Amino acid sequence: MSVRVAVIGTGVMGADHARILTSDVPGAALQVICDANGTRARELGDQLGAAHVLTDPLEALSRADVDAVLIASPDSTHADLTIAAMEAGKHVLCEKPLAPTSQDTQRVIEAENRLGERRVHVGFMRRFDPAYGAMKSAMEDGLVGDALMMHNFHRNVTAPEWFTGEMAISNSAPHEFDICRFVLGSEYVSVIAVQMPSKNAIAPVFLVLKTAGGQIVNIEVNNNAAYGYDVRCELVGSTGSVDLKAPVHATYNASLKSVQRFDADWRPRFADAYRLQNKAWINGISRGATDPRLANAWDGLCSILVAEAGVVSLQTGTWQPVSSPDVPALYQGAKANSSLIVPAE
């Protein structure tokens, strides 16, 4: 039997998720396309053959013929829609962030704990990227010795004029926060963020984080790199390293030059990760066995707590502690990072 999915939000991410579900995920049925923009929803619904097209998300997630909800609406709606979907008995995959603030994320966690079962997952798709997977396996297999540090950079082509350094930390960097925590298996304990002033565009933000396991993580977020979308990472161990480079799709040789082209945004780079994540989500629902790589609501909270500390650090220029609340029993046990190293009391 197919898992009947309602996709809420038909912007860039929502439309991509809907296409992935219809073309690349056996066992998924696109039951509802929902967006406040009815024209856009109808165009996508007709294109993909959705059974229903709606403009009211609460109507979409409360339907008896919907088993699961994929939320890709504006960030400010995520918490309320996730809670409503849970209370309607649905499974949820929510694009990051699960909520814009830790307080709203706690509301989601409290609602899920009242249910007594995990129904919420967060779209940290890099956990399914084959390159990051190889990096994590190399560390766990002891191929590079003990993990010492991770270097990261996250570069986008351009950002709007209103995009701030605080937004770079809260909107862009959470992918690095999550994947480094996932690979290292250790919680963050402190962070410092710096940014040089810029006259013409938002300047890069640089973050350094310390983990409970004694590792250092650094992250460059540059949202005006101009040349293309580029994400790279290096895991440094005591006896070696693992280097995640930009994938080369094609190299053009002409006029005495060799040119490598970069993607314009993140979707081509992480196409496999999105596809594998969505497959894992649907398979977990249909088989009743969750893929341990899927990020849960607690993982969503952890990324937001780091981001909030990072924003304070950027504003004050000082190291900031990262909050580390006790993990509820619901989020302990069978998961990929169940052995996370946590700060000492």
What do these predicted regions represent?
Residues 1-48:
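N-terminal Rossmann-like dinucleotide-binding module
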Residues 14, 54, 71, 94, ...:
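Hydrophobic residues in well-ordered beta-strands that form the structural core
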Residues 16, 36, 226, 266-279, ...:
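Active-site loop of classical SDR/Rossmann-like NAD(P)-dependent oxidoreductases
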Residues 17, 37, 48-111:
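Beta-loop-alpha module in the N-terminal Rossmann-like domain of NAD(P)-dependent dehydrogenases
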Residues 29, 284-302:
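Glycine- and charged-residue-rich phosphate/anionic-cofactor binding loop of Rossmann-like
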Residues 99-158:
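A contiguous active-site-proximal alpha/beta segment in oxidoreductase catalytic domains
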Residues 171-250, 275-289, 308-310, 322-345:
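Contiguous beta-strand/loop segments that form the cofactor/metal-binding neighborhood of enzyme cores
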